[in-house]
Swiss-Prot record:
Species annotation: Pseudomonas putida (strain ATCC 700007 / DSM 6899 / JCM 31910 / BCRC 17059 / LMG 24140 / F1)
Main location group: cytoplasm
Protein name: 33 kDa chaperonin
Post-translational modification: Under oxidizing conditions two disulfide bonds are formed involving the reactive cysteines. Under reducing conditions zinc is bound to the reactive cysteines and the protein is inactive.
HAMAP family to which the protein is assigned, alphabetical: HslO
GO molecular function, a single term: protein folding chaperone
């Protein structure tokens, strides 16, 4: 089978003779769409791309119907990185940063000191799950590896890369005991697949996924599953923005319009879409007329 063209997808794979599974992610267009909406400094672009790759890997690895949200927060130059990806594999991301405090060669600990990582699963049905851990690692790959070793108690490794407008990621995880009942054999097998993944060079990340996996594991029986496409999509809308005004109450919403000189502007932090509401729009919202009239948006 030939390599897939550059696109956006996740692809699961499994080692037929080992208790190990893997997941690969490639993000080109969706990552480019996020970067096109903001003028992020290079270190922010890299971290946001890596977080997007990690989020897509987790959506590909988990079984749920809903939304997965990853947030990395700190009191440093990058106070927030946030990525959302739905079970339909629609992804968006954003960052907040202090441009004058960011240097090109800054490390993760310098950009996000005393940071923490929060994973939220918001299912369509059922209870919301949220877990938070410290950003414990020299880079995001190490942080996610440490997170999942703590939470799932299964050997797990992440490799994340964002460069040249492309984001990539590789996840390896040891499966529960099945094909290899012997403890020593299981550990040797795990160390084998990890050691080969560690040989990945920065310039190899943008090669075709099948070429790369074959190069790493050509001596193993690796079975690839069907790809799962991803795409950028922002869930903001004029209706949601109008609902935010309604939640303020009629008196406060009208007062806000007056304070803003006659027009309230609501900006989407993800896609930079801007929604405008004047006094007549707000009156219509509370009269039950919805958001159909004067539905002006700007980029």
């Amino acid at each position: 089978m030939s390599d897939l063209p550059d696109t956006d997808f996740t692809q699961r794979f499994i080692f037929d003779e080992r208790d190990v599974r893997g997941e690969w992610v490639s993000l080109d267009d969706s990552y480019a769409a996020v970067l096109a909406r903001h003028e992020y400094p290079q270190p922010v672009k890299v971290l946001l791309g890596e977080l997007m790759a990690a989020t897509a890997l987790l959506v590909g690895a988990m079984k749920f119907d809903g939304l997965l949200i990853l947030q990395a927060r700190s009191a440093g130059p990058i106070p927030l990185l946030m990525v959302e990806c739905s079970s339909e594999r629609e992804i968006r991301g954003m960052a907040r940063y202090e441009a004058d405090q960011i240097s090109a060669d800054a490390t993760l600990s310098q950009l996000m000191p005393d940071g923490h990582l929060t994973l939220t699963i918001d299912p369509v049905k059922g209870q919301r799950y949220q877990g938070t851990v410290d950003l414990d690692g020299a880079n995001l790959s190490e942080c996610f590896t440490n997170y999942f070793v703590q939470s799932q108690q299964l050997n797990t490794r992440f490799w994340l890369n964002a460069a040249g407008g492309k984001a990539r990621g590789l996840l390896l995880q040891q499966l529960p005991r099945d094909r290899q009942p012997d403890d020593e054999e299981r550990e040797d097998s795990w160390q084998h697949v990890v050691a080969l993944a560690k040989t990945l060079k920065p310039e190899e990340w943008t090669e075709g996924n099948e070429t790369l996996l074959h190069r790493l594991y050509h001596e193993d029986a690796v079975r690839l599953f069907d790809i799962q496409p991803l795409r950028f999509n922002c869930s903001c809308s004029r209706e949601r923005s109008g609902n935010a005004l309604v939640s303020l109450g009629e008196h406060d919403a009208k007062a806000l319009v007056d304070e803003c000189g006659g027009t309230v502007e609501i900006d989407c932090q993800f896609c930079n879409e801007r929604y405008f509401f004047d006094a007549s729009d707000v009156a219509q919202l509370f009269a039950g007329g919805g958001t159909d009239v004067a539905s002006e948006t700007r980029h």
